[in-house]
Amino acid sequence: FVNKLRYAKEKKEIYASSGMGKTTLEEQIELLQYVEKEGQADLLGLSPDSLTRQNDYEAAQRGLEESLKTGKATLNGLPVVNYGVSAIRKMIESVACPVQPRYGAADARLSDEILFAGGCSNTSPDVFMDFWQHSARVSLEKVVETHQYVGRLMGYYSEHGVPLCAGAQGFYGAGIPPSLQTATVILSFILLAEQGVKHVCVKCTGHGNLVQDVVSSNVRCNLLKEYLNKLGYHDVEIFVGISFSLMQYPVEIGANFAVVFMNTLMSKLIGAQMSDIRTVAEAKAIPTKEDIANTFRTAKVMQNFVQAQKIELEKEEADLEAQMEEKEVRSILDKVLEFGDGDILVGAAKAIEAGVLDNPFAANRAAAGKVLGIKDSEGAIRYLNTGNLPFSKDIIDYHQEKIALRESKQGNKINYETLVNDLLSVSKGILV
């Protein structure tokens, strides 16, 4: 996986990636082989089932046995723990492309052990994603403990000549201004670097405003390097991936091809190696292997169209956006470090309690939920409510001015209905 991304970085190529999971090993292999050939894939995905993610292996075994008996899928992915190392190895050796496990869990230690031993060379021990999004009650300390284990295991592999790549995107990000997500991504990678992780893929969430999306990616990578260097981690290799809008997708398949195009264009503009796409039929039904292959091939052709071109954004607007976002991220990170007196975990725990790290759409009840985002007139995400974020007046004023401009153009005040419409806009085939 690392070598593949290095090649993409050198050649300025963009590799599509997407989750794909079947209940039985035979179906999983068939799917991967089909997408690799018919979709012209460069990377393949593997989605473990939700029972495996919850460590309920007995229930996963019952589902697997029922599927094998009836021929009907009863799980929403591959039960990797129940199948074990030899089966994962068989799957990996059945295709030429690297297979990327794509899932989140508060405790994925056993799954990741099996996946690594079976030949997978990538995973996503994403501390804040798995804290915010995947459990209502799990503590940050527990998630950090399990993810430190995975990070140390990845470091062990790297020390012995097997480079493994860790991905993180902080939280799903839809409807939330990017600086908060950037801060959590950087904190996640610092915690992993402490355990010896040497290769990371910075995941970015595109909202559709190309200036903000490009700036956010650049700020995220630059500040990650800066804070890693500041803390003594000078040898971490950084790759970049992006996904466009993690909210509801259009039901109409034709509109979803435009979403795939947008994802690929964003990848080109930010210099990403990986484009996290969702299949064109995903909002309508469970995607077939043909749906997945068509999606991959679409992304491949779009990549071919833009690869040789030099595309740049208007510099003055991008510079101002970068200046403001960098200031926001530093405000959050410096407060976390202050809370912990240099200890990231202590600082993060106190920051969550104080609402300095926040998420309005978190499943976890520990979130203050005071921060709210809204789109401005050009589709960039602005802070409607900054909650307890440690922002200066000029930052708050900047966002309020952008929101006021949208209100002026619309002729009405922003309200809760506006927020909901923003979250659903892509599913309707519009940005704002």
Regions found by a protein language model. Give the residues of each.
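Acidic, glycine-enriched catalytic cores built around paired aspartates
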Residues: F1-E58, S94-A96, A272-V432
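Generic structural signal for well-ordered, non-membrane alpha-helical segments
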Residues: Q28, G77, V81-V85, A108, ...
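A generic "cationic amphipathic patch" detector
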Residues: Y57, D112, F128, A136, ...
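Short, basic, helix/turn surface patches
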Residues: A73-G77, L153, Y157, L228-H234, ...
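Electropositive, surface-exposed helix/loop patches at the edges of structured domains
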Residues: G84, I88, L231-I253, I311-E338
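Long alpha-helical, hydrophobic tracts
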Residues: E141, S158-A293
